[in-house]
Amino acid sequence: MASVPKPPKGHFNLLYFAGATSFTHKDYEPLPAPLSLAKLFAELEARYTGIRAAVLDTSLVTINLDYVDVPADGSGHDVVIQEGDEVAIIPPVSSG
């Protein structure tokens, strides 16, 4: 992944890795902040139909390099992404 520019004012950067990059055909994209983690997942499902089941349900998430818990029930309203944050979607990687 190349260097990611700062997000525009009022936004955060969402970084995609591995299967998330393949699914979205993007390395990153800026999204409006603030946004709860639950709303982020809903927004991604609206933009990329099927991403929740194919990628998000088995991925790890970081905010500013700190791992955050992603509840299995899809909640996550208490985790709020702020302007300028860097969020990463990290799917499992298999080795062989």
Which residue ranges define each predicted feature?
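Ubiquitin-like/PB1-type beta-grasp interaction modules and other compact soluble beta-rich domains
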Residues: 1-95
